[in-house]
Amino acid sequence: MIYLFILFALIAGMALPTQFSINAQLRSLVGSPILASTISFIVGSIALLILSLFQQGVRFNKGWLEGPWWIFTGGLLGAFYVVATIVLIPRIGAASTVAFILTGQIIASVLIDHFGLFGVQIQSINLYKFIGVSLIIIGVIFVQKH
């Protein structure tokens, strides 16, 4: 079963640079990274709304409003992420954009795990994680070399 999750993660990972490149072309068509991001989010939101309508047992609950304020900021971070990729792809290319984003994701993930931020179970930084992050950063440097 774990292999299916790994495959799912790999496919999701491959979807991101594809989305980035498609959104960069959309920006060229509409002339604005913000408008391209808006269109991308509207299309994605419609797809999610349709999926939500068919999901069993999930309904609006006013208890949702009792969570911490930051729990609803994921969409803002997603919007920043999409705009950033639309701006970066034409300037530094897909490989460099993904390499730098991946580096940022790994660094943030290790810090979130280490400090238990956002309710994540604490997983301290160890030598293996440090070496792994270092190798990713070295890989980004190699991706940048022409």
Task: For the regions a language model picked out, list residue spans one by one.
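C-terminal transmembrane-helix exit sites in multi-pass transporters
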Residues: 107-127
